Amino acid sequence: MSLLDELFPGIFNNEWEAIPKWENEDRPWELLSSRESGLISQISDYNEGEAFIHPEAIIGDFVRIEGPCYIGANAEVRHSAFLRKGSWICEGAVVGHSTEVKNSILLPGAKAPHFNYVGDSIIGIDANLGAGAKLSNVRNDRREVFVTLSDGERFGSGLRKFGALIGDNSQLGCNVVTNPGTIIAPGSMIAPNETMGGWVEVKS
């Protein structure tokens, strides 16, 4: 089983209207890189480098959108949200009030609804970030971000900017902070005010 399938099994449901394509399913974070097959390149294929906004998407007042980005059907981008270059907001996902998203994917039904920061990250299907949760994406020393897998293997990601992979149906409590390179297993329940790193699997 690939890491992509382990963390985001729901994406293999062919009913989704539009989700990114992964070249390396064992290193899903590579989609966040600037390579030709990367996220920004794929978004640009939809709308020549500008923002693609589905006619059924809901965009609130005072939202700032910087292309290229993709906003899918029935996605909701609420008042004063900030979508930076490389944001892919899949169908039914929510970007809430004063939330900032940068070079990241919210898979179908994912929610970053209140005062969140999502940097260089992938949030799984129906996963939810509690109010104030932050997915930090850069180490203080600006060096390469490392990842740890479920078997304890640790290695470099090849990226200096990489936030978190949040598995399908995971729930992060209010004010949770993830260190760069955090991987949260699907269905995990993270208590409020926690700082997380490495491989995380917390069941209720």
Indicate residue ranges for each PLM-predicted region.
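Terminal amphipathic alpha-helical/low-complexity segments used for targeting or macromolecular assembly
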Residues: 1-50, 55-56, 182, 186-187, ...
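Flexible, glycine/small-residue-enriched loop-and-beta-strand segment within the central core
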Residues: 36, 65-72, 76-166, 172, ...
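Short-chain dehydrogenase/reductase
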Residues: 58, 76, 177, 189-190
